[in-house]
């Protein structure tokens, strides 16, 4: 059933989106004194959380909420917040060191910082990789490539190394369109549209996303299909943006935003964390009624699962 496949795709995407953070932390110290005196009020000013209780958040399981409705049928959003022990710099350090590939349930088969794609020649021998190899050899229309990329012929590792190298060099907003879509989807346009659909969030995080940031690439298991992705992480004060700007399948683009505030809970230095997930997927556009609701519920559950994995690893829960 289509909803099941879509839910599994979202599970991998949100797991990765949670914590692809590379350089954040030192800048926090300079921002603490100047930041808003009332984190709860600031949180309410741009999010779906109108009045949170910090003590309850510190002791409760994470409970993501559906974000405001968006006009584009391809788009979906989820927000969540929680309290972690320690100052923002400590929480940021834990985010940087979190490795989703260590959690088999998150289905991140490979994560590599930077833009060296030599590991494409020694990928694991499993079902998702075999699917990707066959799809590449057969020029499957399930692969999201430009017309120029699709026309190239080369061995698997060489082919994908060329595609990923060129796209990584182009940066977030320089991506060529996916030719397997009748709408000629450009990932950079999707990212801008996702943010424009959430004006309060766009205002809160204005200027944080640049061209390249701290780059990484991954191999994901999406419904037993291998998917190669490119992403970049950006930071600005106590804000983080993690942008997935290329995927060989499964979704068009995705953005995860984080805001961190220093708070005191029970006399202990803590950090209030807000996270917002914005996702564009062709699968979503085809879902209606019960199937659409099922996909939304699946995304909420998967965001919760990925946050729980981080909190468990970092000792936050």
Regions found by a protein language model. Give the residues of each.
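Bacterial N-terminal signal peptides that target proteins for export
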Residues: 3-21
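Bacterial N-terminal signal peptides
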Residues: 18-31
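Sec/Tat signal peptide C-region and signal peptidase I cleavage site
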Residues: 32-36
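Eukaryotic helix-grip
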Residues: 37-317
């Amino acid at each position: 059933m289509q909803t099941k496949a879509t839910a599994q795709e979202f599970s991998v995407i949100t797991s990765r989106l949670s914590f692809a953070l590379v350089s954040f932390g030192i800048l926090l110290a300079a921002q603490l004194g100047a930041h808003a005196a009332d984190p709860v009020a600031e949180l309410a000013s741009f999010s779906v959380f109108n009045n949170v209780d910090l003590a309850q958040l510190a002791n409760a399981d994470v409970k993501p909420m559906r974000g405001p409705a968006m006009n584009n049928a391809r788009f979906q959003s989820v927000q969540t917040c929680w309290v972690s022990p320690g100052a923002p710099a400590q929480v940021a350090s834990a985010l940087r060191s979190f490795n989703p590939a260590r959690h088999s349930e998150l289905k991140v088969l490979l994560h590599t910082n930077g833009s060296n794609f030599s590991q494409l020649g020694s990928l694991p021998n499993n079902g998702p990789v075999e699917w990707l190899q066959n799809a590449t050899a057969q020029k499957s229309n399930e692969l999201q490539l430009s017309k120029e990329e699709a026309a190239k012929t080369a061995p698997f590792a060489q082919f994908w190394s060329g595609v990923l190298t060129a796209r990584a060099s182009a940066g977030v907003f320089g991506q060529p369109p996916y030719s397997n879509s009748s709408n000629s989807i450009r990932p950079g346009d999707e990212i801008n549209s996702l943010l424009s659909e959430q004006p309060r969030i766009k205002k809160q995080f204005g200027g944080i996303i640049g061209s390249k940031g701290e780059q990484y690439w991954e191999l994901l298991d999406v419904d037993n299909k291998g998917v190669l992705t490119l992403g970049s992480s950006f930071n600005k004060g106590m804000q983080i943006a993690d942008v997935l700007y290329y995927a060989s399948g499964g979704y068009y683009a995705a953005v995860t935003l984080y805001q961190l505030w220093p708070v005191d809970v029970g006399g202990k230095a803590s950090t209030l964390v807000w996270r917002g997930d914005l996702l564009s997927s062709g699968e979503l556009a085809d879902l209606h009624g019960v199937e659409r609701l099922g996909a939304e519920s699946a995304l909420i559950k998967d965001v919760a699962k990925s946050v729980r994995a981080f909190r468990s690893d970092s000792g936050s829960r």
